[in-house]
A protein has these predicted regions:
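Glycine-rich, mobile lid/loop segments that gate access to catalytic sites or pores
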Residues: 6, 48, 66, 73-77, ...
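Conserved phosphate/anionic-ligand binding catalytic regions in large, soluble enzymes, centered on
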Residues: 8-10, 14-19, 114-130, 244-269, ...
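A short glycine-rich, hydrophobically flanked beta-strand micro-motif that places a catalytic Asp/Glu
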Residues: 37-41, 165-171, 233-237, 303-314
Length: 418
């Protein structure tokens, strides 16, 4: 019997994502000037106000207020009528020095002995139902909002869009977990009050999103996914009515509140730890990336069609407490999942320092992760510029989304005789 599965996404202008991007922009600036910085940075955004809090151990000094303002402006909050914009909002920072009690557990005599920054469990997931080994409902939800943001920035085909938006996609699956069709799509987008007649305004928004946005999204999809779109999709466009008041003025945003959007859209599992605002000594972040790296490479190597990988750590201890694997009965090798987990520990070093080194996590690569998902993104190298209050600037080429590389596939094929 078929079933329905749903995932959601939120845009870069969603209040929680504004907070995530501010936190990760600050992380990037610390790492750009001192790669060994230890940083935990939380942000709260609300009407006309940003509050920063956290703990830092670093050799560099930053103008965090300026970084926050620049990030807000880049997202698109640049007008006073939004009641939250980068030029006029207040920015209060209470960031202070990291606790020595915590630092003692992380810093060791040799980098290899670096302990985990906290206890916790982290998961990685991958499936072969999309080309980037991500769950389809989440992938489509992200793509809808990325295309909507592109339309907003182009300011041509649709000229009334504001930064805050959300999407949700429901897919019908067969009883053997094959996507059959898209059942429903929900899109809520903030907009200017461009017509006095609210009904006419909402009709215009619905028409534009169905006839401009959706065709642009579909055109960029593989043919195997395009065929899932049909004339019977149940669309809900701004179902509550007008959405003029939005962003941090409409809802308070906090760092780390969109952890399911950030990962797998409800597929697989989540250990509960957020990513944004944390340097890579925090295994909530680094180990979750490592688990995705392992899971994606396992599926790409043909070991299985779907996999969930878990790792656990104790604070101050380098070696993981354990590794767990679930292939959901899709493995193409004659090994039980426990044996696959054991081979993983032989295949890759999961100590925090080894993860940081392998995935190049001590680089300023995190702002780009803070919207539209940390997983399933395109591995690429970009040029980024960073500035200090004293006028010093640094231009860097950094490699983004290293955990999406498939360079572990040959070793997996050898280890499992694939």
């Amino acid at each position: 019997m078929s079933y329905l599965f749903t995932s959601e996404s939120v845009s870069e202008g969603h209040p929680d994502k504004v907070a995530d991007q501010i936190s990760d922009s600050i992380i990037d600036h610390f790492l750009a000037f001192d790669p060994q910085s230890k940083v935990a940075c939380e942000a709260l955004v609300t009407t006309g106000q940003v509050i920063l809090a956290g703990e830092v151990k670093s050799k560099t000094y930053l103008d965090v207020q300026k970084i926050a303002r620049n990030t807000i402006n880049k997202i698109g909050y640049t007008k006073g009528e939004y009641m939250f914009d980068g030029n006029s909002c207040g920015v209060l920072s209470t960031i202070h020095e990291q606790s020595e009690d915590i630092n003692r557990g992380v810093d060791k005599a040799t980098p290899e002995a670096q302990g985990a920054g906290d206890q916790g469990i982290m998961f990685g997931y991958a499936t072969n139902e999309t080309e980037n080994y991500m769950p389809l409902a989440l992938e489509l939800s992200h793509r809808i909002l990325k295309e909507l943001a592109a339309l907003r920035r182009e300011d041509k085909a649709i000229r009334y869009l504001r930064p805050d938006s959300k999407s949700q996609v429901t897919i019908e699956y067969s009883d053997d977990n094959v996507p059959l069709r898209i059942d429903s799509v929900v899109i809520s987008t903030q907009h200017d009050p461009f017509l006095a007649d609210e009904k006419a305004m909402l009709n215009t928004i619905e028409k534009d999103l169905k006839t401009i946005l959706i065709p642009r999204v579909v055109a960029k999809l593989p043919q195997s996914i395009q065929v899932l779109f049909n004339d019977n999709i149940n669309y809900h466009i701004n179902p509550t009515g007008k959405f003029v008041i939005g962003g941090p003025h409409g809802d308070t945003g906090l760092t780390g509140r969109k952890i399911i959007v950030d990962t797998y859209g409800g597929k697989g599992a989540h250990g509960g730890g957020a990513f944004s605002g944390k340097d890579p000594s925090k295994v909530d972040r680094s180990a979750a990336y490592a688990m995705r790296y392992i899971a994606k490479n396992m599926v790409a190597a043909g070991l299985c069609d779907e996999i969930l990988v878990q790792v656990s750590y104790a604070i101050g201890v380098a070696e993981p407490m354990g590794v767990y694997v679930n292939t959901y009965g899709t493995a193409h090798v004659s090994l039980i999942d426990g044996d696959i987990a054991k081979k993983i520990t032989e295949l890759i070093d999961l100590k925090p320092a080894a993860i940081e080194k392998r995935l190049k996590l001590r680089a300023p690569i995190y702002l780009e992760t803070a919207a539209y998902g940390h997983m399933g993104r395109t591995n690429r190298t970009v040029e980024k510029k960073f500035e200090q209050p004293n006028g010093e600037s640094k231009l860097m080429n950094v490699e983004l989304f290293t955990w999406e590389k498939l360079d572990l596939v040959p070793a997996i094929k050898t280890a499992f005789n694939l």
